[in-house]
Structure formats: structure tokens, C-alpha cells
Amino acid sequence: EKSSGAAHPLYVFGQAGTGDGLAMLLSALVVLALFALMWAVLSRSFLQITTATGASGRAVYRERTVKRQSADAALFRKELARFTASPNYMLNCGLGILLLPVAGILLLWKGGEVVPLLDAIFGARGGCAEVLLCTGVCAVASMNDMATPSVSLEGKSLWLAQSLPVTPWQALRAKLKVQLALTVLPALVPLVCMAAVLPLTPSLALSAVTALAYIAFSACLGLTLGVTRASFTWTSELMPIKQSLAVMIAMFSGWLYAVALAGLYLLAGWRLGAAAYLAIFAALTLAAAGLMYRWLKTRGAKRFAAL
């Protein structure tokens, strides 16, 4: 049976493989058109690229007014620039920035089918949709762990950060803020989409609080591991980004948190109700994050200064 709509080009391409003359002709015309387009694009720039000498024009100085900013803002911009300047850093430690909005859009698109399915499977456990969707947000957010290797990535230039006229805590707080900013903002997309596909209940609000609490917990845990497991003997930045024990612990802790959040609810937490369960989980998560935040501000800052 012939297909129609967006899948029709694939149908024609498949028919060409069966020996259909018209389909083979159409496929050949499309390939030739693409070839002609690429030829036109390359003919404009290929010769210039291959004959370039690498010489560049002399830079002309233009006086500009520099806007004054606080030390905290300057440190934040420094850490953000370090993250965006490294493709390896962004790809391995910031994948959640892309996947969180994608997950939200998918939920908005398929939420009308997913939520009734969850209710049908776990009908006896009320509020299961809120807990499981919150679990999904936490699992995707765990892919952001840019604070964990940030201390080790200072490398031989660590002395610069230590010699700046700022406190060690200010330097650590800037690293913490980068992960929080780059995770909270994308996470708002799926959380808002959850509000669009689920009824407005206390458990829905608490699922958002739990997800944001986990993001704070994850950032504090990652930076704590980064300070305690700092290594400056690497020869490639991929070593602290992908191969360090601190990054591995941070990554697996996010998965374990998601498993615990969903698993404990399905085992026994549903008897408390989704709202009470999420409130308890959020409180415990914030308490753990608060303890690590206090350690970073006191002993962690001293340890960073002594590295």
C-alpha cells in the first residue's frame, strides 16, 4: 500500500531498490540536485580556503567603555566562559541543558497518552504520574555535572584563582552558580509542561519543589566531590571530565536518587500519598544539600585555598 504525507519520499526511495523505473529516476534527480547545490556552495569558498596563507589583518584598537561589575559577577562570567569554551566540557557535563527542554516538549506532545497509561498501570497508587515524571526530570538533570570537574580543570592555573582578591568561597560559589543556572533554567521547561498535562494539585507543586531540591543537592554534591577529589596531574582535559572518580560518583548518585525516588514510592511510599511523600523527600534532599553547602562554605573553602 502506498504511503502518503511526510513518509512518501522514503517510500519512493524504497521502491527504487525494487527496480521501479520512475522511483529510480526521481531518486537520481534528487541526488543530482543535491550534488549541484553542494558544487555551487564549494565553488564559492573552496579555492579561497585551500590557497589561504593564514595571515590576518592587523587588529585596530578601538576604545570602549568597560562596564564595572562586582567580583561575584566577574567570577561567574569566568566560569561560564570556561564551560562554553570547551566542546568536551559542554558535551560530557552539560547534556541536560539540551535534553531537559526536549523532554518537556515530548511530554507536552505525548502527555495525553503517557499520563493515562501511567494511571492505568499504577491505578492503585494515586499520584504516581507526578512522582514518576518528577523522577524523569531528576534523572535528566543529573546529566549536568559541570561543577564536579571544575576545580580539577583549573590545572596549573589554579594559583591564579587563589591569588585573586576574592575569598576562596567566592571562587567556589561561582562554580556552584554556573551549574545551578545552567540546570534550573532548562528544568523549568519540563516542570511547566507537567503543569500543562497534569491537574493542578499539591503533589504537582511538590514534584517541582523536589526536582529543584535535587538540582541544588546535585550541584553541592558535585562541587564537594570536586574539591575533595581534585587532581591537577592530567595531560588531557578529558581525564577530569570523563575519567575521574568524582565524576563517576556524581553521575551514579543521580541515577541512584532517581531509582530511590520512584522505587520507594512504588514499594511503600504511595500509602502516605504523593504530596506527603514528595514533601518528605524534598525536605531530606534540601537538608543534605544544606549540609554540603555549609561544608563548602567553611572547610571546603579552606581546602580549596590549600590545594
PLM region spans:
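Hydrophobic alpha-helical transmembrane segments of membrane proteins
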Residues: 1-159, 167-307
